[in-house]
């Protein structure tokens, strides 16, 4: 049965829009856990556009399930992760001009720097995942440099313009899962997943955790966060 990791970045985005203290992502994380989330995911960006250092520190003290920190593989972020010690870190690409993470890491190009970051984080007892496209070459290099997990970037599937394109993207994801499992890599998935499409990916099998944020927070505005998390959790677990 797959797990649901709830990304609460958008709660912080709303707070930062007015520069105040509400809504508090710490409170949102607690509600998500009460509703059945198996973990909480946050992205501490270098520009601190949404999640703040304060959020990370308090969440480390309050999260009762698992805390997954998305981060760039920089010296600053590695040092922060080692000080706070989330259960897991997901290394992601980061561009200051992007609205959200636009694609997977190019592990082949950055493998030396990523290997150093992975080794430091693992030495601190942290599970390390790499956010990558469902590309066999990227998966093989992720395994080569010692990652514990990959998180498959599902954005191309979510943005497919036709049924045929969607099917082709699903095949890529399925093949990526099979290869990662063959290499003894754990597999997570995320980006662009919603109430209308997540079951198609979950039905593939072999994916341990789905990290979902925007779709849950969008529904939460209409039905409340508790209900939104429960609905998504049911889709993920019983696909």
Swiss-Prot record:
GO terms for molecular function: pyridoxine 5'-phosphate synthase activity. It is found in: Cytoplasm. Keywords: Cytoplasm, Pyridoxine biosynthesis, Transferase. The record marks 151 as: Transition state stabilizer. Its EC number is 2.6.99.2. Its main location: cytoplasm. The keyword Cell inner membrane does not apply. It catalyses: 3-amino-2-oxopropyl phosphate + 1-deoxy-D-xylulose 5-phosphate = pyridoxine 5'-phosphate + phosphate + 2 H2O + H(+). Pathway: Cofactor biosynthesis; pyridoxine 5'-phosphate biosynthesis; pyridoxine 5'-phosphate from D-erythrose 4-phosphate: step 5/5. 1-deoxy-D-xylulose 5-phosphate binds at residues 9-10, 45, 50, 100. 3-amino-2-oxopropyl phosphate binds at residues 7, 18, 192, 213-214. InterPro entries: Aldolase_TIM, PyrdxlP_synth_PdxJ, Pyridoxine-5'_phos_synth. Coiled coil: none annotated. GO terms for cellular component: cytosol. The active site is at 43 (proton acceptor), 70 (proton acceptor), 191 (proton donor). NCBIfam families: pdxJ, PRK05265.1-1, PRK05265.1-3, PRK05265.1-5. Homooctamer; tetramer of dimers. Belongs to the PNP synthase family. Catalyzes the complicated ring closure reaction between the two acyclic compounds 1-deoxy-D-xylulose-5-phosphate (DXP) and 3-amino-2-oxopropyl phosphate (1-amino-acetone-3-phosphate or AAP) to form pyridoxine 5'-phosphate (PNP) and inorganic phosphate. This is Pyridoxine 5'-phosphate synthase. The gene is pdxJ.
